[in-house]
Every structure is written in C-alpha cells, then in structure tokens.
C-alpha cells in the first residue's frame, strides 16, 4: 500500500433545507391555518479515527467532501429530514490543521474518536412560524441557512512507543526487520527507506510498537529531505533509539548531526529519553569497536550499547532496554493522569 502522510482537502457542511408554505386542508374546515413545517438541518462534516488504517492515501484521489442539504419542510407541520453527514475516516494519529498548517483543529489519538469539524446550516422556517394574531395566513418562509466551508490539512503522525532515528544507512530498517514482522525495503545505500514503517515488537511477554523513519540529514528541521514530516512521526514516541553507523569515519559527527536536528525541530524531541547504540559492529575489528565506542560515549555523555541488526548481536538486550524505558514512560503518564483527575475531583467549587 502506498503511504501518504499529508494532504489538503476541501470541506463543506450541508445547507439547511427551506421551510414550507402550506395550509391545513381538511373536510369541513374551509379556512385551515398555516401548517408549513421547518426545513431540515444540513449534514455535518465529521472526522473519525478508525483502526486498520496507517496512511492518508485515499485522500489523494478525492479532495472535496460535502455533506448533504437538509430536506424541505412539509405540510401538516412536518420538518424536513436532516441532511446526511460527510464522515471522513482517518488513521489514529491524524491531526486536522487550518489552512495555515499551524493551527490544530483536531487531534485524533484514539480509535472511535469522532469530532464535528463543520456543523450543517439550520433549516429555514415554514409559514407556520410566522402565524400571528395580525397575520393569520402568512406566505412567508426562509430558505435555510448555508453550511460552513473551509480548506484544511490532514497530517498523519504515527503513534508508536519507540522511534528509530539516525543518518541514512544507519541500519534502522535492518533492525526493525530483525525484531518485528515489518518488511521495510533494505539495501546498502542511503535513502533506501522513503516512508515511515511500523513494527510490533515482542519482548518477553510484552509488546510495543516501533517506528522507523527515513534517515535524517543536516537541515531536516527546515524540511530538507522532507525532514519535518519525518520527524513528526516520532513526536508521539516515548523513547528514541539513536542508531549510529559504526562503519562511518566520524561517529561523533554523525551523533551530533541528529541531535542538532532534534533540538532545532522542537516539539520536545530533544528531551525524550534516548538510547544510543553503535550499529553494524559485525563489520568492525575489536580495536575499531573500542575506539569508536569511546568516541561516541564522549559525545553522547551516556552509555553506548553495541548492536548488529544483521547478525542479531545485542538485539535482545536492546529490546529489553527499550521496554524498560517504555514502562517508565507509561508509569509517569499514568501518574500524571491520576494527578489531573485528583485535582479536578477535589477542586473547590466557585459559587
């Protein structure tokens, strides 16, 4: 399936239906009063997060979405039917942005979440509404109020527990393929991975979701190599696994380049828990391995794990280290949620 994580679409809610002009007509009632009903309300534009989707590719082929108009009012004081809603089904993790691409209108983070983006117009009044003591046979009605319309952007930010970051050809896709059933494209040249990939990883009796994004380059925070869109896919992760290619000449420069891009991108990426790993150690001599590990540790100012996605060396240890960070993050999130709930529950009521 092709991957699309950003698109622009046009939305319009339904116009309200017109009110009716009608008069009561029954046997033995010669001059029945007005009984024209109101028009129906126009359909809403609704966005819904659904399970089983991980791309916005459907919105490449259809960019205009319009809800139906409300039904006409009818005699005997019957209101028109409500217009049919336009429901946009999107993957979990989709954000709806205003035309400026900055203002977030909706953030779809849970399966089944539904948000009304545009409300349908109200139905018009039928002539029964205008009946009065001085106007007993009105022929007035209103046509219904127009619906809302706007252009919006849909932006998908994948939801994963852990994210893989690193320069192109750092071995991220090889690692993902080694620990999950994901099958990203793998080759011995930079920029093999051009779209994000998700894999479900089994660590003991627990599972977590790992995201592999295309390799970052210098200037990614400014959009070079579509870097800003790729970085958005690791915004929601709980921990980052930073892979550094051990066969590179300068592992310190490789590490600092990615850290700089994370810091300049913002969004809290630079503050996320980070595990640093020297990858492709199967291609290094013992002397090269120790030399580069020491260099990388000096730049990262933290322990450096050793890894080879190709041979499996260090993979299991890495999975349980990732799981440990994920557990800690989940625990902190649960405590924060409990604290918020406690404050709401015991907040003083203002009279």
UniProtKB/Swiss-Prot annotation:
InterPro entries: G_OBG, GTP-bd, GTP-bd_Obg/CgtA, GTP1-OBG_CS, GTP1_OBG_dom, GTP1_OBG_dom_sf, OBG_GTPase, P-loop_NTPase
SUPFAM superfamilies, sorted: Obg GTP-binding protein N-terminal domain, P-loop containing nucleoside triphosphate hydrolases
Residues covered by the OBG-type G domain: 160-327
UniProt-annotated binding residues for Mg(2+): 173, 193
Domain Obg span(s) in chain numbering: 1-159
Cofactor requirements of the protein: Mg(2+)
Principal subcellular localization: cytoplasm
Coiled-coil intervals, chain numbering: none
BP GO terms, sorted: ribosome biogenesis
Residues reported to bind GTP: 166-173, 191-195, 212-215, 279-282, 308-310
Gene Ontology cellular component terms for the protein in this record: cytoplasm
Enzyme class: hydrolase
Keyword Hydrolase attached: yes
Keywords: Cytoplasm, GTP-binding, Hydrolase, Magnesium, Metal-binding, Nucleotide-binding
Compartments where found: Cytoplasm
GO molecular function: GTP binding; GTPase activity; magnesium ion binding
HAMAP family hit by this protein: GTPase_Obg
Family: Belongs to the TRAFAC class OBG-HflX-like GTPase superfamily. OBG GTPase family.
Role this protein plays: An essential GTPase which binds GTP, GDP and possibly (p)ppGpp with moderate affinity, with high nucleotide exchange rates and a fairly low GTP hydrolysis rate. Plays a role in control of the cell cycle, stress response, ribosome biogenesis and in those bacteria that undergo differentiation, in morphogenesis control.
UniProt xrefs under NCBIfam families: Obg_CgtA (TIGR02729), PRK12297.1 (NF008955), PRK12299.1 (NF008956)
PANTHER family, sorted: DEVELOPMENTALLY REGULATED GTP-BINDING PROTEIN-RELATED, MITOCHONDRIAL RIBOSOME-ASSOCIATED GTPASE 2
Subunit structure: Monomer.
Protein name in UniProt: GTPase Obg
């Amino acid at each position: 399936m092709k991957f699309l994580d950003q698109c622009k679409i046009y939305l319009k809610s339904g116009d309200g239906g017109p009110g009716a002009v009608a008069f009561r007509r029954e046997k033995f009632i010669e001059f029945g009063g007005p009984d024209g009903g109101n028009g129906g309300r126009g359909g809403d534009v609704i966005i819904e997060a659904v399970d089983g989707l991980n791309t916005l590719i459907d919105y490449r082929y259809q960019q205009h979405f319009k809800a139906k108009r409300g039904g006409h009012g009818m005699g005997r004081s019957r209101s028109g039917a409500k217009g049919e809603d336009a429901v946009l089904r999107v993957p979990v993790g989709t954000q709806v942005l205003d035309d400026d691409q900055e203002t977030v209108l909706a953030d779809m983070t849970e399966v089944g979440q539904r948000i009304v983006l545009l409300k349908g117009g109200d139905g018009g009044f039928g002539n029964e509404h205008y009946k009065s003591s001085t106007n007993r046979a009105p022929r007035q009605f209103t046509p219904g109020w127009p619906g809302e319309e706007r252009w919006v952007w849909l932006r998908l930010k994948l939801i994963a527990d852990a994210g893989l970051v690193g320069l192109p050809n750092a071995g991220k896709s090889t690692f993902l393929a080694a620990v999950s059933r994901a099958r990203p494209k793998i080759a011995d040249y930079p920029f093999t991975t051009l779209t994000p990939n998700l894999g479900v990883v089994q660590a003991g009796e627990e599972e977590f979701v790992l995201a592999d994004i295309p390799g970052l380059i210098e200037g990614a925070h400014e959009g070079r190599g579509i870097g800003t869109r790729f970085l958005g896919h690791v915004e929601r992760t709980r921990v980052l696994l930073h892979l550094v290619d051990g066969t590179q000449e300068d592992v310190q420069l490789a590490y600092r380049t990615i850290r700089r891009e994370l810091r300049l991108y913002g969004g809290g990426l630079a503050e996320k828990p980070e595990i640093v790993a020297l990858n492709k150690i199967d291609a290094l001599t013992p002397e090269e391995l120790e030399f580069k590990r020491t260099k990388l540790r000096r730049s990262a100012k933290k322990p450096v794990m050793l890894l080879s996605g190709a041979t499996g060396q260090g993979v299991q240890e890495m999975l349980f280290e990732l799981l440990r960070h994920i557990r800690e993050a989940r625990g902190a999130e649960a405590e924060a949620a409990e604290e918020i709930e406690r404050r709401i529950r015991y907040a003083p009521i203002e009279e």
